[in-house]
Design a protein with these regions (language model features):
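Positively charged n-region of N-terminal signal peptides that target proteins for export
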Residues: 1-6
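Bacterial N-terminal signal peptides
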Residues: 7-18
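Flexible coil segments in periplasmic/lumen-exposed cytochrome c-class electron-transfer proteins
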Residues: 25-39, 50, 58-78, 109-188, ...
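Short Fe-S-cluster ligation motifs
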Residues: 79-100, 228-240, 354-373
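Aromatic- and charge-enriched surface segment that lines or borders ligand/interaction sites
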Residues: 91-107, 111, 133, 246-250
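Extended, polar beta-sheet/loop recognition surfaces of beta-rich domains
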Residues: 257, 342-387, 391
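C-terminal structural cap/anchor segments
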Residues: 316-357, 373
Length: 416
């Protein structure tokens, strides 16, 4: 499963409610590829890596980019397409302008609307030149004759997506901000465009379109917690507020993008594929540019219900027994013990799903991605009951200056 399952969910839920999903100026500060002008296909490979194309277009055990990844939704299953240059089952018959149209408008060569599991709502911001580089790269791939399984019946209905697009989609390339540095603009271009970070990290409205007034304030997604087991996750708030990335520095973010670990956190869950197949391949300059842009994001502080003192106290003993050895009595963790939970965006997230998942299932970490003396956290699903998981979660969400809404045993039960 992939973090972008949320985009398929957009299409599915909009269909179930009767509404489906369906050129500006190039930014001056957005260089189109790594320096030293490598051949177009090599530029395209790098850009496709930033877009993380391989994760959503490569099924388990399948050929790279041949599609077939299932996007499970409440109204059926949607499968990713074959984007190898096979002329019959892939996109071998596509021309460069066909890919531009698909990425910029969400329209296929035959005029049908694409589902936003393919995040054209973000890709519309990518320059024509960069799309052409990606096209050049895709043409070099091994053609694979493979037809993904048929989509669920409701996904055969595509025309209503045009209405959704008119309501919520704005086509156009990303314009540079003359008030910001070239590095900031480069970071904005990568985060907003190919990186499509908002697809997971921005909350959605009633029709499951991204809320333009609340960018990067966290979003609900669906992904695996264990083999063949999908549960909700909460993609953290990326703004520099206290409950977001306020405790992170630009250096922390840049290191995390390139290695999956930093003094603040290590990758786990839905971010694993994003790190391994995409961000880890960034040049140092681009990783730093993205970090500069992300660190500039602003949003309001949380003002809702907070964990009460009695709820905090109820989980203190569990934390001391099960968590303190690695995360410390101060919640600050350490290079030789574990990541901090004080100031953690995951711990303080508006939705507690990701925190609960870590406690229940442990954070699955990519092989070889270890920081300092951090040990792999065990699963507590068979050790702690729902009340205990809620209690220790509340202790962390209400201690060391953390502030977040309380977690209930019912919420824990939903994640099992």
């Amino acid at each position: 499963m992939h973090p972008l399952k949320v985009c398929a969910l957009v299409g599915a839920l909009a269909l179930s409610s009767g509404i489906s999903l369906g050129q500006g100026n190039a930014p001056q500060g957005a260089a189109t590829a790594p320096v030293e002008s490598p051949p177009p296909a090599e530029r395209g490979r790098y850009l496709a890596d930033i877009g993380n194309c391989v994760s959503c277009h490569t099924r388990a055990g399948g050929e790279p980019f041949a599609g077939g990844v299932p996007f499970q939704t409440p109204v059926g299953t949607l499968y990713s397409t074959n984007i190898t240059p096979d002329p019959k089952t892939g996109i071998g018959s596509w021309q460069a302008d066909d890919l531009r149209r698909a990425m910029h408008t969400g329209i296929a060569p035959d005029g049908s609307h694409l589902f936003p599991a393919f995040p054209y709502t973000s890709f519309t911001k990518v320059t024509d030149a960069d799309v052409d580089y990606i096209y050049a790269y895709l043409r070099t791939l091994k053609p694979v004759s493979y037809t993904p399984p048929a989509n669920g019946a409701l996904f055969s209905v595509r025309w209503p997506m045009g209405l959704w697009n008119k309501m919520f989609f704005r086509e156009g390339r990303l314009a540079a901000d003359s008030k910001q540095s070239e590095e900031w603009n480069r970071g904005a271009y990568l985060v907003e465009g190919l990186g499509h970070c908002s697809a997971c990290h921005t909350p959605r409205n009633l029709f499951l379109a991204e809320q333009p007034g609340n960018p990067y304030q966290g979003g609900r997604i669906q992904d695996s917690v264990a083999p063949d087991k999908v549960r909700p996750w909460f993609a953290v708030n990326l703004t520099s507020q206290k409950h977001g990335l306020g405790a992170w520095s630009v250096a922390d973010l840049s290191k995390y993008f390139q290695t999956g670990v930093s003094l603040r956190a290590g990758t786990f869950g839905p971010m694993n594929e994003v790190i391994v197949n995409s961000l880890k391949r960034l040049t140092p300059a681009d990783a730093h540019a993205m970090a500069v842009y992300v660190k500039s994001l602003q949003g309001p502080e949380l003002t809702g219900e907070a964990v009460a003192a009695a709820q905090v106290a109820s989980g203190a003993a569990i934390y001391k027994d099960r968590c303190e050895k690695c995360h410390g009595g101060s919640g600050r963790g350490g290079f030789f013990s574990g990541p901090p939970v004080a100031g953690s965006a995951v711990v303080q997230a508006e939705g507690p799903a990701s925190l609960i998942n870590i406690v229940l299932y442990g954070p699955t970490v990519p092989q070889g991605m270890k920081f300092g003396g951090w040990e792999t956290m065990p699963s507590y699903a068979d050790i702690l009951n729902d009340d205990q998981v809620a209690a220790v979660s509340n202790f962390m969400r209400g201690s060391w200056g953390n502030r977040a809404a309380p977690v209930s045993a019912a919420q824990v039960a939903q994640q099992r």
